[in-house]
A protein has these predicted regions:
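Conserved switch/coupling elements of ABC/ABC-like ATPase nucleotide-binding domains
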Residues: 247, 251-263
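Conserved ABC ATPase signature
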Residues: 172-176, 180
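Conserved ABC transporter NBD signature motif
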Residues: 92-104
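ABC ATPase C-loop
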Residues: 189-190
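Catalytic Walker B motif of ABC-type/P-loop ATPase nucleotide-binding domains
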Residues: 197-200
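H-loop/switch region of ABC-family ATPase nucleotide-binding domains
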Residues: 233-234
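ABC ATPase NBD coupling module
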Residues: 104-119, 265-266
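Conserved ABC ATPase "signature" region
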Residues: 150-168
Length: 375
């Protein structure tokens, strides 16, 4: 999912139609803590025969930070569009089952009504940013709810402060980094006062610093305990420490797992891997190392856990012997080969900016060289 349709890009901020209330009242009592309920939800896009997802049922309450996983094509992004009414109201698709947002049936309430209860942040923040300053951008939604000016400004300030952008409120969004623009999109959702936040791959187009910026903002929201968050994400290295629950869809878009992070990502990692579901890098590495004879109980999720587990055990004998043989063969091959590329003391400037400084490297036959660095 890269972006919503143009007509729906800002539909969460559309003013209510005549006869609608700007702030519908959610169900109270026991239902109050439940922000979202999906009951056997299936979605069939226009022109398609099969529903994807086919049957999804789960709930989200305040304090839940839910990671929604599934193989490519299982309908995760499609499902996110049903959580705030874009399906069926703006995106042509048939919906079966029931989506309830704060007790309201999403099929019979408009996107404008639902926007006060659920905000959505897409993969590409530029699809949602339309004004000339950060403050104007965050005020756009509350203004379209016809709130008093003082309330609009109060909401905008609170939202910008929560994502660390208040001091830059007069700047053009174009001056922000990718991570900054995504934080701005999150602030726009927060300013609507929505207790539920849905994020569809919010870090897909970001560098490591941008990813850190987004999750720093989300960590603060999750710590408050007053929001519910649904996260669709492929970068599980960043997401795993942040979430407290995992829901998994199979290839047909049917829920096959719903539980705590350890129960799902550790306890069912091999099953998820066979299904084509993304896993944390350290968990994938541990699965491969386990095939080579290493023992992991439990499976690691983070690099620190993987490192600690490896430090506690010697390498299996077969691995040590294979490594020694490979090392000897590599040394023989490289020593007999020639240099293909040699760089010495390279400095490069673009206009007044020095982008490379005194770089030296050598590439020989048999080398597999990776060059990494900050953007």
């Amino acid at each position: 999912m890269t972006a919503p349709p143009d007509s729906a890009a800002r539909s969460a901020s559309v003013a209510p139609a005549p006869g609608e209330t700007a702030t519908p009242k959610p169900t109270h009592g026991r239902e109050h803590a439940r922000l979202l309920q999906l009951r056997e939800v299936g979605i069939t896009h226009e022109g398609e025969d099969a529903a994807t997802p086919a049957s999804v049922s789960f709930e989200v309450s305040r304090g839940d930070v839910v990671l929604l996983l599934g193989p490519s094509g299982s309908g995760k992004s499609t499902l996110s569009l049903a959580m705030n009414g874009l399906i069926p109201h703006a995106v042509p698709a048939a919906l079966t089952g029931r989506v309830e947002v704060a007790g309201m049936d999403a099929a019979t309430h408009s996107v404008a009504q639902l926007s006060t209860q659920v905000g959505i942040v897409f993969q590409d923040p530029d699809a949602q940013l339309v004004t000339g300053t950060l403050l104007d951008e965050v005020a756009f939604g509350p203004e379209n709810l016809r709130l008093p000016a003082a309330d609009v400004l109060a909401r905008a300030e609170s939202a910008l402060r929560r994502v660390g952008l208040w001091e830059r409120r007069s700047e053009n969004p174009d001056r922000l980094s990718g991570g900054g623009r995504q934080r701005l999109a999150i602030a726009c959702a927060l300013a609507m006062g929505s207790p539920l936040l849905v994020l569809d791959e919010p870090t897909a187009n970001l560098d490591p610093r941008g990813i850190d910026d987004v999750y720093a903002a989300l960590d603060e929201l999750a710590a408050s305990g007053d929001k519910g968050i649904v996260l669709i994400e492929h970068n599980l290295d960043a997401a795993a420490p942040f979430v407290n629950r995992v829901v998994v869809l199979d290839a047909a878009g049917v829920v096959i797992a719903d539980g705590a992070v350890d129960e799902i990502l550790r306890g069912r990692a091999a099953e998820l891997h066979d299904l084509g579901v993304w896993l944390p890098t350290s968990t994938l590495a541990a699965l491969r190392l386990r095939e080579a004879g290493y023992r992991f109980d439990p499976l690691p999720i983070s690099p620190d856990e993987l490192r600690a587990a490896l430090d506690r055990q010697p390498a299996p004998a077969a691995t040590r012997e294979a490594g020694a043989d490979a090392g000897a063969a590599t040394e023989t091959r490289v020593s007999a080969s020639g240099t293909r590329i040699e760089v010495r003391g390279l400095t490069l400037r673009r206009k007044k900016t020095e982008v490379l400084t005194d770089v030296s490297l050598e590439v020989r036959d048999g080398d597999f060289l990776a060059i990494v660095g900050a953007n």
